[in-house]
Curated annotation (Swiss-Prot):
It comes from Escherichia coli O6:H1 (strain CFT073 / ATCC 700928 / UPEC). Keywords: ATP-binding, Ligase, Nucleotide-binding. This is Putative glutamate--cysteine ligase 2. InterPro entries: GCL_type2/YbdK_subfam (IPR050141), GCS2 (IPR006336), Gln_synth/guanido_kin_cat_dom (IPR014746), YbdK (IPR011793). Its EC number is 6.3.2.2. The gene is ybdK.
């Protein structure tokens, strides 16, 4: 399928996607009943969309195009009520978190969807292992060239986004010692990590044409880069965050990305070059492994800085942009989080350290989601 032309969209508009866990009490393992829930709610959603993801234990909540985080929060809140009622009617529960702490990937059923079934044929068991749960944020752009500039700019802050959203310390019944273990699941995919370097939209079109020769890429949706342009929406999509435990944190993360995008495209503070990516995977690893306690290294100067310090600097830089787009509350909340030194991964570990079980942890996450 050829790459569509870049659809011009209103700059800095938002679209947010949350991949949620569908769980089956009282054992709180993943259920395989997302299709049943989708059928139950499809005529009751008035704004946004509830849809399938890769496997039957995953449920995606997606907003429509939103002006700001307040509009997105309203849509999510309405969807949440409908989904929670349908889940209760079917004796199921819903929660966030980047991974389910003890599910077995071998039990996961891939959705009966043409694209996902084709992906299963291409990638085999890797697709079942990809039963992990992330937050994706789309930001509108006025042109393809703006999208490429924004993609490179946001890529500088991938470690910051990962550290702030880290919520996947447990996997397959084990403490992984990572704050965010979810991104590791995609490490075997040939398109894992950053997009290959291009400097403008024309070069991106050539890149996509080359990738399509592999026969594994039918559309932009088949590429699993950390950040990717979405020409059919006219957006740049950031895909590195774990799904948070609460809607409020998800909305705050979206506000952070929207404000960062506004700062990048209005001030153009960087002259991007391929060398910017020299230490990308090392810095990304630090964020996944250690969260805000990780240390990132500047590929140009060799300077090292804690992610706590680097994130506080980013929040300070984008505060004026946040005021302009109505995201100040998000930046203030994230600032409090960084100063406190807490993230959701650490809260999960604290629960287990205090004697809680992994079953109890999932139950608690369901209560958090339902009680917000």
């Amino acid at each position: 399928m050829p790459l569509p032309d870049f659809h011009v969209s209103e700059p800095f508009t938002l679209g947010i996607e949350l991949e949620m866990q569908v769980v089956n009490p009282p054992g709180y393992d993943l259920s395989q009943d997302s299709s049943m829930l989708i059928d139950a709610v499809k005529n009751k959603i008035t704004a946004g969309e509830v849809k399938h993801d890769i496997t039957e234990s995953m449920l995606e909540l997606a907003t429509d195009v939103c002006r700001d985080i307040n509009q997105a929060a309203g849509q999510f809140s309405a969807m949440q009520k409908v989904v929670l009622q349908a889940a209760a009617d079917h004796h199921l529960e819903i929660c966030g978190g980047g991974t389910h702490p003890f599910q077995k990937w071998q039990r996961q059923e891939v959705c009966d969807n043409e694209r996902y079934q084709r992906t299963l044929q291409n990638f085999g068991y890797l697709i079942q292992q990809a039963t992990v749960f992330g937050q994706h944020v789309h930001v509108g752009c006025a042109s393809g060239d703006d999208a490429i500039y924004l993609l490179h700019g946001l890529s500088r802050f991938v470690p910051h986004f990962i550290a702030l959203s880290a919520a996947s310390p447990y996997m397959q019944g084990t403490d992984t010692r990572f704050a965010s273990s979810r991104p590791n699941i995609f490490s075997a995919f040939p398109d894992n990590g950053p997009m290959p370097w291009v400097s403008n939209w024309q070069q991106f079109e050539a890149l996509f044409r080359c990738l399509s020769y592999t026969t594994m890429i039918d559309s932009i949706k088949d590429l699993h880069w950390d950040i990717r342009p979405s020409p059919h929406f006219g957006t740049v999509e950031v895909r590195v965050m774990d799904t948070p435990l609460t809607l409020s944190h998800a909305v705050n993360m979206a506000g952070l990305i929207q404000a960062t995008a506004h700062w990048l495209l209005t001030e153009r503070p960087f002259k991007h070059q391929e060398k910017d990516y020299l230490l990308y995977k090392f810095n990304r690893f630090q964020a996944c492994r250690y969260g805000l306690e990780g240390v990132i290294t500047d590929p140009h100067t060799g300077d090292r800085r804690s992610l706590t310090e680097a994130t506080l600097r980013l929040l300070e830089k984008i505060t004026p942009s946040a005021h302009k787009i109505g995201a100040s509350s998000a930046i203030e909340a994230l600032h409090r989080q960084v100063v406190s030194g807490l993230n959701e991964a650490q809260l999960m570990r604290d629960f287990v350290a205090d004697g809680g079980s992994l079953i109890g942890l999932v139950k608690k996450h369901c209560e958090i989601w339902a009680g917000e």
